[in-house]
């Protein structure tokens, strides 16, 4: 049977830490808690489960803290939860079974990650696979009978275990601060972080957040030869221009995208702009484009229930205006269709 080290980094997690550890502690052969500066009862709560509690000076880098926690592990595999995660009874049983039968050649186990919708800042599906269990020591093996080479790719097992991510607040402001400091220090972001920064801005960013990010995304949009990065830049700029009520700037960006390969987010921002200009007829066309004619690249809601809610608002506004009998019948029918679509819409499963 494999042995597990739980390695967790924490800061001021007194409200959720016990809930997390209660759900997995009995499956762990050691529990390692790395505290990055708690001022509440986090460390006292952790002490009920382990004496392996270490302090780590926060340097604005989650990876550095996690690497430090991994250095303390001694078991076969490392399980790396966040304090606001929970394994329910059924998935606790699945992890217990996995521990009994886990083959030693498996180097990473992925688990399905499900976040409470209210505080979902990065997921565009009900669940997504994330690596959560890691073999502590990896051995290298040669492959191919001739022109042999060392296998570099890890052996990954996609399990059916579902981790419930249950945060009690948004962490966007913290994330934005780290993105900004990384850009200030290094000047660039990786492909992954470029997408994640744009995604969080589109999902939860307010005007202040977008204004701080504006110059970096403006430069990215103007200079990149990566079509995905250009698309991310267009989305962020469009939202920023719309929140600033800068119609000229919004149209300058959006019309370039609409002329080529528009995404749902740009259509959604155009729709919100026209709705703010008290033009529900024009807004409804762009909400419809966002929902049925384009695909979302950063925020699934812009091409899903968000666009449908916008359509509903447009039709309700129009029905409050003076209309011909034919127009009233048409918009009433469209409103009913939008309401039905809203009731049927669900996040993609994965």
Regions found by a protein language model. Give the residues of each.
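Acidic helix N-cap motif at the loop->helix transition within catalytic regions
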Residues: 15-18, 40-49
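N-proximal low-complexity "stem/linker" segments adjacent to membrane-targeting elements
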Residues: 1-23, 350
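Short aromatic/hydrophobic "clamp" motif used to bind/position activated sugar donors
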Residues: 78
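Catalytic-site signature of metal-activated, phosphate-bearing donor transferases
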Residues: 64-70, 81, 88-208, 212-217
